[in-house]
Every structure is written in structure tokens, then in C-alpha cells.
Amino acid sequence: MTRGSAAWPPLPPRLKPIVEAEYPRYSAAEMASRRAAVEAALAAADCDHLVFYGANRAGSAVQWLTQWPVTVEAIGVFTLRERDALFVQWINHAPLAKRLAAEADVAWGGESSIGAVIAALEKRGARENRVGVVGAMNFAQHAALAARFGNIVDLNRAYVRLRRVKSQEEIDWLRIGAWLSDRGMAGLRDGLAVGLNERALGDLIERAYLREGGTNVIHFIGATPMHDPQLGVPAQFPSTRRVANGDLVFAEISAAFWDHSGQVLRSFAVGEEPPPLYRALHAAADAAFDAVAAVLNPGATPAQVVEASGVIEDAGFTIIDDLLHGYGGGYFPPDRKSVV
């Protein structure tokens, strides 16, 4: 492993004001554009109201519409020409939610957030079969909505379609997430040493971006002898195995900036140069990256991507992880009509 004097990744100066803001915010124009898109989706589905849901730090629609990142639970009500109603758990989360979701009417969800949502819909005159939902609500919550408002329209696929093409502002925030992820990898590169266990490697990674406002999404780490490899992918949970000379240490890192994350994967040879197998693997990986990147143009199909990846099999290898996926919205279900 040669450290040299490799520089840490720079942040483009135009993005510094976003990172340094007390609480970064999307512009009013960006938020208005999102609302217009949701209004059009509701009209297409013959719905008047949208219930959007998130829990356990998942549920991107909540933040996308209100700028409140989900913590324990958050359920919102979107209605044309009205302020959103947003009900959060727990009560001690409500003060900050009110500050960040300043354009919504925010309240604690009380003993039942879905009960509060139903009351809000009733107050807004919601009719049967005219309420849509985005987010992974549980069975009891869906049943409660359906008992009061009839057939509930699943708008999750419509929401995914809205999110597939990112705005320029979203791309900027994702660039920050990528910068933070790169910092994590740089921290691993510069701190990696014989004798550290995988838990300590995770500390190197997180320490590199936490101070800049990043949060951990994943840092999968693998360490294995290059002459007797036992791992094909970085492990999802760190072990207490200690790094030794002759190891390959490889990592998959995603750090996020307000739920906008990047992803980076790198490998480091410890104490000696990589043997022929690892050189061949990395040569095949580089060739596959270049071949796939060359076909990623508007209108490209998944079949073209798979065809381009044939250089992997041509080199005598295969893959045991995703060949290609998008970022900034999650993994999407297969769609026969999908184009890049």
C-alpha cells in the first residue's frame, strides 16, 4: 500500500454555502416544482389528497415534500392549495420538525399518527376513493384509512417516476454526499495500518466526514489475505479481525448529506503489491466500468448495459453484486419499458 501524499477530495466552492448553512434548505422554486409534480400525479390518479409516510429513518417522500428527514415516524397530508399537515413521532422531535418543515403545519402525532391523519383528512373534506398513499404504511394504518375513505390509491410507482430525473439542486446535494463518501475513503486510505481491526477501520471512515456534516449510510469493510482470499465482497458487519501484511482491504462506503448520499468502492493492498489474480480482477473491473459508462446515454436500455458488461465474462470472471444501479431514491422494481 503506497500512501504518497494523495490529497483529500475538494468540495466545489459553489457548494460550500449549502454545507455551511445552519440547516441547509432547498429553494422555494425547487419546492414549488415538487408540489406541482405531485398535484399532476394526483390529478392523473383521480385523487384529491396524498398521504405520505415514513418511519425508522426511511420514507423519502416526507423529506422531499417538507424538508423534514424522517426519524421515528412522520405522516403527512398533501392537499391542493393547502399547507401540508405533518404529524411526527415522538413529541420531543416536534420542535425541530416545526423548524425544518417550516411550510407545513407540524404537530406531534399523539397516541396514533394515523388517527391524526384521518382527522386532518376529514377536516379537509376528503371523499371516498379519492385518497392516495406514498410510503410503506403498515397493515393496521392502511386498514384504518380504507375503513374511513374506501379504496386507497397506491401512488408509490407514480412517486418513483417523479424522482427518477433529478433537478439541478438535487444533483448538487448528491454531489455533496459523494464528496463526503470520498472523504470517508480518504480517511481509510490514510489511516489504514497493520494491527487495526475492522471496527477501527470504520472509525477512520466515519471520523473523516462527521465533522463536515455527513452521516453514515453504510461502510462495508472486508479484509482478507491476497494469497488465500476468503471474501468476494466487503462484509456488511465489521469483525474483530486485525489487518495483516499481505491483506487486501476493500470497502463500500456511502455517506449522506441530509439523506443525499454518494457511494464509492476501493481496494488497498497492504504491505506488498497485489498478486496477478487481483491485478486481473481490477483490470476487468476497470474495463467493465468504461464499457458500461460508454453506453449510459439517454435512451439506453438495460439490455445494452448487460451486453457492455460482457468484458467481465470475457476475462473469466463473474459478479456477485449489482452491475449497475441508480442512487438518490432507492432501487426500483424491474420495468420492461425502462430506459436510462
Regions found by a protein language model. Give the residues of each.
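Active-site neighborhoods and metal-handling regions in enzymes and metal-associated proteins
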Residues: 1-340
